[in-house]
Amino acid sequence: MQPLINRRQLIKGLAAGTVLSQLGPLPALASENKRLFVDGLCFLPDDLADLGASGIDAYLCDISAIEAMKQTDGTTNYKRTYQACIKSISAAKIRVEANSDKLILGLNANDINRAKQSDRTAVFFQIQGADCVEGSINNGLSQVDEFHAKGLRALQLTHHYGNQFSGGALDNDASGGLNLPLTQAGEALINKLNDNHILVDVSHSSPQAALDTARVSRSPIVQSHGAVRALVNHARCSPDEVIKAIADTGGLFGVFMMSFWLTNDKVPTVDHYINHLKHVANVGGIDAVAIANDYPLRGQKNLLKLNNNNAEGVKQYLSWWHSLREKNVLGYDIEPEHVVIPELNDIDRMNRIDLALSKAGFSSNDRDKIMGQNWQRVLSDVLV
C-alpha cells in the first residue's frame, strides 16, 4: 500500500472554549455510548470486568515482557527479548481465547465491529520494542513470522533507547541527544512488517528514525502513544515534522496520559490534554488524532492507591528522571511535579475525554474520528 501523501488538510478555526478542569461522573453520556472507542495502548487487565467498565471497544494491547538492563552510561533500559516475549504473547493468546465471552483477538479491523456488536473488546497484540526479533536479522527476520502467527499485529521499533533497528528518543552522549536514524536492518524490518501486514509503531523512536520510517514504509505508520514537543520541550515528545510525516503516510498520532510530558505547569488538567489533541489536529489534520492511555485500564495503579496524590506519586520516577538529567537529555532539567491528570486517571476516561472534546468545540464527526474511527481506518488499511 502506497503512503497517502498530503491527503489531509490542516484543520482551522477550532472553536474556542475551555474544558472544565474538574469532571465529575458522566451518566448523561450513557445514551451516547454508541460512539466507537479505541485506545492506542493499554494492557490485559487483571480483572476482566474492567473491559466492560471502560467502555472501550478495542485497543492496542501491549503484551511485552521485559528484562531490565543497565546501560554503560548508568541508565536502565528495558529490553523486550525474544524469549520473554514469545512466552508472554503465547500466554496472552491463551488467556484471550479462554475468555471469548469478553475478548476477541484482533487480527483485522473487522474484529472491531464484531467486538462492538457483541459487547466484547477486541485486543490487537503489540510489543513495545523490536528487540524481540533482533536474533533473526541474519535469517530473514523469521522471528517476525513467529510472532505474527501468534497474533502480533503492531510492533514498536524501540523503547526509549536505540537498538539494532532504530535510534531511540533518549539516546544521548551528554550533549543533548544523538537523534540516531533508522538502520539498514531497520529498513529491512519495515519491509518485513509491511509484507506481513503488521502495523509499524514509532513511539519512543528518535525523530530522525521516525522520519526515516515514514519515508521507507509502504503502509501507514503510527505513533501509538506520545505527546507534542511544541507544547513540552522534551525528548520523549515529538516535533511537528514527525507528526506531519506520520499523518502523510495515512497514519495517526495517539496522545497519552503521562502528565509530566503533557505540561510543565504545577497542576495538570484536562485542558492540557486537549491542547495536545488540538495541536496534532492543526499539524497533521483531524484524521491523524487519536487517544492513547499507556497505563492500565483503571489508571496508573500507584496513583490510584494514593488517591491521585501527584506530589507523592511522582517520587517513584525521580531516580530515573535524575539519571537522565545527569546525561543532559532534553527536558530532564525540569523537575516533574505530577504523573497523571486526576480526572483522566479513571476507568471512565474515554467518556470524559469525549465530553471534554465537545466542550472544546470539536464537532460530533471529529469526535467520532478521534475517539475511535481513526484507529479503525488505519487498522483497516494495514491489517488483512
Regions found by a protein language model. Name each.
Residues 174-265:
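Active-site core of metal-dependent hydrolases
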Residues 4-5, 11-167, 171-176, 233-243, ...:
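N-terminal hydrophobic targeting/anchoring segments and the immediately downstream early-domain regions
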